[in-house]
Amino acid sequence: MLDSLSVLNFYSLASLEVGQHWYWHIGGLKIHGQVIAVSWIVFAILIIASIAATRKIQKVPSGIQNLMEYVLEFLRDLAKNQLGEKEYRPWLPFIGTLFLFIFVSNWLGALIPWKLIELPEGELAAPTNDINTTVALALLTSLAYFYAGISKKGLGYFAHYLEPIPVLLPIKILEDFTKPLSLSFRLFGNILADELVVAVLVFLVPLVVPLPLMALGLFTSAIQALVFATLAGAYIHEALESEHEEEHA
């Protein structure tokens, strides 16, 4: 009896969802449409900003070109600080794309009360408000640092699992599983909590009252994007760096 109840409780918990999803049915698949729809908005913002900044490039930058150059310098310094002068260039596009996508997604979630926008079914939300998005970004990061290690060291990359002593093999394997989990849940939890608090306050009180909290949400959203991109760079650097280099660092 207790076993059957525990199984029922497990399945009831597994069926719980955060928010009301806007489902798209494609073939036999059911996907979260709000993630794709708002992701398109994020892509559109980034593409339009890039075109506007590079349409008329001037030797003395001004306006949006000046802003874009500042962003590029910031991303270059971020990648260089994590990967070093020799290794950062090939990985700058990946780390920069991660940062910009997460940053714009987070700010859209902090600035726009998506949950108050009524749809025939479900609700809109920032892409990073969905655990599937954050897990996908974390898995991409995992694939990136595995690729970095294998491309530089070949199959010898996996020898680090046996260092400094083979008995640590289970812990090293567990560490590689916890890296994407920590990245995804940290980002998901922070963005979801911020959106929920702002949505509830906007619903209960006049818009002026939640403004300070929205400003704090903007700061937190930027920090989360920076943390994710920084850790991604650190993990890739760890995969590229040999044990000999670590000892002399």
UniProtKB/Swiss-Prot annotation:
It is a multi-pass membrane protein. InterPro entries: ATP_syn_F0_a_bact/chloroplast (IPR045082), ATP_synth_F0_asu (IPR000568), ATP_synth_F0_asu_AS (IPR023011), F0_ATP_A_sf (IPR035908). Its main location: membrane. PROSITE patterns: ATPASE_A. SUPFAM superfamilies: F1F0 ATP synthase subunit A (SSF81336). It is found in: Cellular thylakoid membrane. The keyword Plastid does not apply. The chain crosses the membrane at residues 33-53, 92-112, 131-151, 196-216, 217-237. Key component of the proton channel; it plays a direct role in the translocation of protons across the membrane. Belongs to the ATPase A chain family. F-type ATPases have 2 components, CF(1) - the catalytic core - and CF(0) - the membrane proton channel. CF(1) has five subunits: alpha(3), beta(3), gamma(1), delta(1), epsilon(1). CF(0) has four main subunits: a, b, b' and c. PANTHER family: ATP SYNTHASE SUBUNIT A, CHLOROPLASTIC. This is ATP synthase subunit a. It comes from Microcystis aeruginosa (strain NIES-843 / IAM M-2473).
